[in-house]
UniProtKB/Swiss-Prot annotation:
This is Ion-translocating oxidoreductase complex subunit C. InterPro entries: 4Fe4S_Fe-S-bd, 4Fe4S_Fe_S_CS, Ion_transpt_RnfC/RsxC, Nuo51_FMN-bd, Nuo51_FMN-bd_sf, RnfC_N, Soluble_ligand-bd. The keyword Iron applies. It is a peripheral membrane protein. Its main location: membrane. The lineage of its organism: Bacteria, Pseudomonadati, Pseudomonadota, Gammaproteobacteria, Enterobacterales. It comes from Escherichia coli (strain K12).
């Protein structure tokens, strides 16, 4: 009973929710054996044909390459690509690739030489003697990737599994309509496929190995059973035909009954899955020593005259393959890379075949029907019933259309396998898969931007922390430098402290002076004299330095004298040519004269009432008289040059002249009656008289040269003459006094 139950358990399969049964259309291409395609003239090899970053170029334009020669270096998750044939690298430039967006990617363009020469191949027939790491590294460097459609690097996938893998699943379901590449590969190369499975099992050491294949491939099932007849370590499980039973999560559940958690991987539950084509590529890489340079591609559709499966070199233009199969395009011909549900339409036929290309479908106009116009969602829930991932496609559609990224993420849009079952059953002809692809791309872009922002923030915070640490260290250094003086400063401080202590000690000592003795201050006096001598020497040195710095250059002195003379001449010319900007107002002059008379009367009263304690100094009186004469001459000139706006009163002028004569006589009498204590210097008096005569002559010349604009007032002339007579009389008296 237990054996029967174990056998039942061993062969048990599970069924997943949802799924559809579209027309298979596989008989068009699975009836003919694999065949080779003639080499194309030009090959375009994109550097990135897998999930992850592109490798580093190791060839340049003009290089000769052989088939299997690496074009890039694979480091980390970067997978290298290899030359599909021998030839010459003619260009390394962007080129449109096999992608729904048809964006250009960096590619190596090779012109084939037709010889198709291989690099030296080193196969490991005894791979069981190799370590796990060596096998994984060889698989990675030979460019093996998942050929089922994902394109994930096989070496990285094997390395990530580690020792946790208990079940190795080989996906041979190939559930999508039209595609028969794996079916034909298993029919023609079953032994090589099984050998590749054994290499994977040797690396992973799983507890069980399962091959899942749909029951619509009877020839492939027969070939595998024949190869596995003597093997007990590999189990072949035939499953019902249902789309998409070939999905990784769906096939895992069908064969093991285990579900991959949301956001997780199959390795989390101890399962690792590889494709049939990947197993065959592993065999060729390890045992034959051949990098992946070709793969099986299905050429099908009613627009192709000879449908079938071919060995297509990577980098071969799609146009070359279709033309070799008898392509008969219509007016609006469509070519799909992949199947009708998960594939995408090519914008043109010059894109190259890559590692994930498994089918080229060229349907006729009647084969797929006319494209239907998209209509509004009626919420019929047919898409939810057909979804194999147990999602709500109608809700995801609304979230994607409304740019509600958070809600779309909450409803597990990342679990969508883009199988197209929802779009197939939609009565409104809504291309749901396109909406979901766009939404996932936008979410990925947002997360990438958030990641960049987080990295930038981390870098900024690290920089700020570094600056704060440097600032704290700098302040600490400054603080330490301020607290701890330098060596020479320490010596100076110690010397100063020693002097202070010595003085304090001397101050505390009692001074004892014996009777009859004087204190000996010779040392102090000598020190004082030394300081004085030092100060004098320093002063003399400073004086010499200043004298040396201020020695006049003869040329410089001459230049300065010339400049002084020029300035003097310029000043004389300005004074001679200057025209009075403002005329003297007679009324203002009269007011000033009245003020002067009042001050003179006040001074006379003070002198009359005062008792002279001291005699008047004749020299001081002479100076005051000279100042008075100068002021009088200045006033006369201003009055002579002024244009009288109003007539002067004759009586007032006569009064002013009389007052002036009285003041002059009084001042002449004071020096005459004074007893001089000291004799006036005759030479000084002569000089003053000469200066007065020179000024008088100058005044006469100015008056003679002046152009009288108006007639001179006779009364004013009389006043001026009286003043001149008084001045002359005073000068004569002064001369007599000097002679006595």
């Amino acid at each position: 009973m237990l054996k029967l139950f174990s056998a039942f358990r061993k062969n048990k399969i599970w069924d997943f929710n949802g799924g559809i049964h579209p027309p298979e259309m596989k008989t068009q291409s699975n009836g003919t054996p694999l065949r080779q395609v003639p080499l194309a003239q030009r090959f375009v090899i994109p550097l990135k044909q897998h999930i992850g970053a592109e490798g580093e170029l190791c060839v340049s334009v003009g290089d000769k390459v052989l088939r299997g020669q690496p074009l890039t270096r694979g480091r980390g998750k970067m997978l290298p690509v290899h030359a599909p044939t021998s030839g010459t690298v003619t260009a390394i430039a962007p080129h449109s690739t096999a992608h729904p967006s048809a964006l250009a990617e960096l590619s190596v363009i090779i012109d084939a030489d037709g010889e198709d020469c291989w690099i030296p191949r080193d196969g490991w027939a005894d791979y069981r003697t190799r370590s796990r790491e060596e096998l994984i590294e060889r698989i990675h460097q030979f460019g093996v990737a998942g050929l089922g459609g994902a394109g994930f690097p096989t070496g990285v996938k094997l390395q990530g599994g580690g020792d946790k893998i208990e079940t190795l699943i080989i996906n041979a379901a190939e559930c999508e309509p039209y595609i028969t590449a794996d079916d034909r590969l298993m029919q023609d190369c079953a032994a090589q496929v099984v050998e590749g499975i054994r290499i994977l099992a040797h690396i992973l050491q799983p507890r069980e190995i399962l091959i899942g294949i749909e029951d619509n491939k009877p020839q492939a099932i027969s070939m595998l059973r024949a190869v596995l007849a003597d093997s007990n370590d590999i189990s072949l499980r035939v499953i019902p035909t249902k789309y998409p039973s070939g999905g990784a999560k769906q096939l895992t559940y069908i064969l093991t009954g285990k579900q991959v958690p949301h956001g997780g991987r199959s390795s989390d539950i101890g399962v690792l899955m590889q494709n049939v084509g990947t197993a065959y590529a592993v065999k060729r890489a390890v045992i034959d020593g051949e990098p992946i340079t070709e793969r099986v591609v299905t050429l099908t559709g009613e627009a192709i005259a000879r449908p079938g499966n071919v060995w297509a070199r990577l980098g071969t233009p799609v146009r070359h393959l279709l033309n070799d199969a008898g392509f008969c395009p219509s007016a609006d011909q469509m070519v799909i890379m992949g199947g009708p549900l998960m594939g995408f339409t090519l914008p043109w036929l010059d894109v190259p075949v890559v590692k994930i290309t498994n089918c080229l479908l060229a349907p006729s106009a009647n084969e797929l029907g006319e494209p239907q116009e998209e209509q509004s969602c009626i919420r019929c829930s047919a898409c939810a019933d057909a979804c194999p991932a147990d999602l709500l496609p109608q809700q995801l559609y609304w979230f994607s259309k409304g740019q509600q990224h958070d809600k779309a993420t909450t409803h597990n849009i990342a679990d969508c396998i883009e199988c197209g079952a929802c779009a197939w059953v939609c009565p409104s002809n809504i291309p749901l898969v396109q909406y979901f692809r766009q939404e996932k791309a936008e979410i990925a872009a947002i997360r990438q931007e958030e990641k960049r922002a987080a990295e930038a923030k981390a870098r900024f915070e690290a920089r700020q922390a570094r600056l704060e640490r440097e600032k704290a260290a700098r302040l600490e250094r400054h603080k330490s430098a301020a607290v701890q003086p330098a060596a020479k400063d320490k010596d100076a401080i110690a010397a100063a402290l020693a002097r202070v202590k010595e003085k304090q000690a001397q101050a505390t000592q009692p001074i004892v002076i014996k009777a009859g003795e004087r204190p000996d201050n010779s040392a102090i006096i000598a020190a004082r004299e030394a300081r004085k001598a030092q100060a004098r020497a320093k002063q003399a040195e400073l004086q010499q330095t200043n004298d040396a710095a201020t020695v006049a250059d003869p040329r410089k002195t001459a230049v300065e004298a010339a400049i002084a003379r020029a300035k003097a001449r310029k000043l004389e010319q300005q004074q001679a040519n200057a025209e009075p900007e403002q005329q003297v107002d007679p009324r203002k002059a009269a007011v000033e004269a009245a003020i002067a008379r009042a001050k003179a009367r006040k001074l006379e009263q003070q002198q009359a009432n005062a008792e002279p304690e001291e005699q008047v100094d004749p020299r001081k009186a002479a100076v005051e008289a000279a100042i008075a004469r100068a002021k009088a001459r200045k006033l006369e000139q201003q009055q002579a040059n002024a244009e009288p706006e109003q007539q002067v009163d004759p009586r007032k002028a006569a009064v002013e002249a009389a007052i002036a004569r009285a003041k002059a006589r009084k001042r002449e009498q004071q020096p005459a009656n004074a007893e001089p204590e000291e004799q006036v210097d005759p030479r000084k008096a002569a000089v003053e008289a000469a200066i007065a005569r020179a000024k008088a002559r100058k005044l006469e010349q100015q008056q003679a040269n002046a152009v009288p604009e108006e007639q001179v007032d006779p009364r004013k002339a009389a006043v001026a003459a009286a003043i001149a007579r008084a001045q002359a009389k005073k000068a004569a008296q002064q001369k007599v006094v000097n002679e006595d």
